[in-house]
Design a protein with these regions (language model features):
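Patatin-like phospholipase
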Residues: 1-36, 44-282
């Protein structure tokens, strides 16, 4: 059983989009896909088999003022850096149609990670095949300070990366004996507390366990990477890691930079395809 784990990283995740399209071209379809934040948001087009859709999303939509920007964050009806209705409703349902029928026919399982605001713990949810407003994907992408809390079944959730940034262990628990893990940070990256971390901790002080998860994220991330790389060295997982992200940051919208990062991911996967197939056949 093949698992595919997709780290988040907002615009940096365009690297993963190139890899996913290369996998689709070579008919490498995972039985279990799990994504965090943008990893899940882009991963759904892998599950629907729509090669090139993520590239169009990145280069034609993400850089527009309609898609994201500070003005959306201060809009009391939106309260998010991204235009929520446009990104999760208008784009997939009108301007860049998502193939719901193909997704319904996907034989694998697709999960997203979210963090429960009440207790700071990770929850792993199947991405519905009939939610045309993508509420779960909004939740897994809900970065602290940049998104409102997203309600699902009466509970409030935010970005899955806070509690489980690289959920490959969940794929193993699901029964995957072969695992592809796609990272979006360069090899050797060590996470440190971001400048906004202290502000986020204060902002969410009414939810102390959630604030604690934010405070300890860097330490847990680095431990996870170290353990993952041990498994890679033992040949138990196949890991894609970019050597560079070409200066693409979290909210990058420059279509030239995004295309360059996508192409890099695509070419990386094609270059590694023989080794990947050997791993899958072991």
């Amino acid at each position: 059983m093949l698992g595919l784990t997709l780290e988040g990283g907002a615009s940096r995740t365009v690297y993963s989009c190139g890899i996913m399209d290369a996998l689709l071209e070579d008919k490498i379809i995972a039985d279990y896909v799990i994504g965090v934040s943008a990893g899940a948001a882009f991963g759904v087009s892998y599950c629907s088999g729509q090669i090139g859709r993520n590239l169009r999303l990145a280069t034609e939509f993400m850089g527009t003022k309609k898609y994201m920007g500070a003005r959306h964050l201060i809009d009391p009806k939106n309260r998010c850096y991204y235009n929520l209705d446009y990104a999760y409703n208008v784009v997939p349902n009108v301007e860049l149609p998502f193939d719901y029928e193909a997704y319904r026919n996907f034989k694998g399982r697709f999960c997203a990670v979210v963090t429960n605001v009440k207790n700071g713990k990770a929850e792993y949810m199947d991405v519905p095949k009939d939610d045309t407003h993508w509420n779960l994907l909004r939740a897994t992408c809900a970065l602290p300070l940049l998104f409102p809390e997203i309600e699902i079944n009466g509970e409030k959730y935010m970005d899955g990366g806070i509690s489980d940034s690289i959920p490959y262990l969940q794929a193993i628990k699901a029964g995957c004996d072969k695992n592809i893990v796609v990272l979006t940070r360069p090899k050797g990256y060590v996470k440190t507390q971001e400048p906004a971390t202290k502000l986020a901790i204060k902002y969410y002080h009414k939810h102390p366990e959630f604030a604690e998860a934010i405070a300890t994220r860097a330490e847990r991330y680095n431990k996870c990477i170290a353990e993952l790389m041990e498994l890679k060295a033992e040949g138990k997982v196949f890991v894609f890691t970019p050597k560079t992200t070409f200066g693409v940051g979290r909210t990058e919208g420059d279509p030239v930079k995004l295309r360059k990062l996508y192409d890099y991911g695509y070419n990386h996967a094609k270059w590694a395809m023989d080794d990947l197939k050997k791993y899958l056949c072991k």
